[in-house]
């Protein structure tokens, strides 16, 4: 399973991802598929500490509800494209705890596989507010909740006090209060 993103009013173009931040753009009308990964690296058997970016096995991909030509993708940082993935801009610093001692090969010391997708200190969920363009919420697999209210220029750690390390796997912006979000930590 992985994230999929598309324009609900015109679902012909679909973005889908896999491990290591691989992301494809698929055109349902033509059947064509094209890799649009931000940084062309396939780091099988490369320790995450030696990679440019760290991606969760299921790295978030979303389209903006305000401009469907804008897509976001996340690793340990957030990327933005306004041209359907032809070019990308990094719009955040590392939003994780960036614990280098946990960036061993194959996900070590937590998992011991060599597929290259077992990274830690990654963004596991990303959403843009439907109330206001440029308000993005990001959750990580190390329990951090971050928000930007200016399209990524500035990010604030808004992790509630007392929350321990955990995987943030869902963020829903309140439909009634644009400054609040509901978060699931597991």
Model-identified regions with their sequence ranges:
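Beta-propeller blade termini and top-face loops
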Residues: 1-186
């Amino acid at each position: 399973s992985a994230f999929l993103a598309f324009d609900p009013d015109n679902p012909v173009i679909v973005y889908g991802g896999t491990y290591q931040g691989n992301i494809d753009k698929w055109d349902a009308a033509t059947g064509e598929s094209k890799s649009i990964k931000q940084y062309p690296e396939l780091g099988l058997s490369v320790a995450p500490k030696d990679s440019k970016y760290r991606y969760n096995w299921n790295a978030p991909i979303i389209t903006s509800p305000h401009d469907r030509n804008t897509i976001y993708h996340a690793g340990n940082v957030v990327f933005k494209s306004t041209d359907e993935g032809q070019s990308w801009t990094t719009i955040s610093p590392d939003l994780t705890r960036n614990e280098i001692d946990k960036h061993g090969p194959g996900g070590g010391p937590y998992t011991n596989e060599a597929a290259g997708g077992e990274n830690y200190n990654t963004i596991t969920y990303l959403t843009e507010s439907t109330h206001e363009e440029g308000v993005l919420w990001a959750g990580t697999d190390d329990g951090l909740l971050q928000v930007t209210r200016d399209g990524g220029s500035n990010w604030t750690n808004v992790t509630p006090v007392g929350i321990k390390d955990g995987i943030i796997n869902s963020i829903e912006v309140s439909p009634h209060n644009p400054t609040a979000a509901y978060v699931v930590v597991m």
